[in-house]
């Protein structure tokens, strides 16, 4: 019998992505501290947090394969998180205007039964077009992306902010690299097809 699957996330976007596999899973809140360490790279941060989230659910789900994921964006070498306020969202989008912004998504598949983790970092590049202040304000007013790294939702109106998207898996930008996850699940004996 295959192990049950758990998504260690309360994100409705990650849940919708994982639903694409048409494979049964549960969700749980990992309830972890997402602070970065001094000098920690974006890649190291998202991998550490993805694994931390997955392992945080291990005690309550000791028989499960647990999926953890975390994402940050980097603008001009600086790690940018969720804006939380309209003012911060405006600042983030002004900084992104005309730039190539890299999103790093950490993915962990933790086998709570064996204690083994498979952890990766998937980059994704977003080429922003030049944005006017009015476009930024209208976008934020219409979509309110205050809990999204980088202050946009590409699955919605955010697509109008870009010239080009570049990466292995477009799902990565929304927060869950499904191509990499399928590969990890296959190593654990779970076939999606």
UniProtKB/Swiss-Prot annotation:
Top-tier EC class: hydrolase
Site (Important for substrate specificity) location in chain: 13, 71, 155
Protein name in the entry: 7-methyl-GTP pyrophosphatase
GO terms, biological process: nucleotide metabolic process
Catalytic activity: N(7)-methyl-GTP + H2O = N(7)-methyl-GMP + diphosphate + H(+)
Pfam families, alphabetized: Maf
Gene3D superfamilies hit by this protein: 3.90.950.10
Disulfide bridges in this chain: none
Organism this protein belongs to: Photobacterium profundum (strain SS9)
Keywords: Cytoplasm, Hydrolase, Nucleotide metabolism
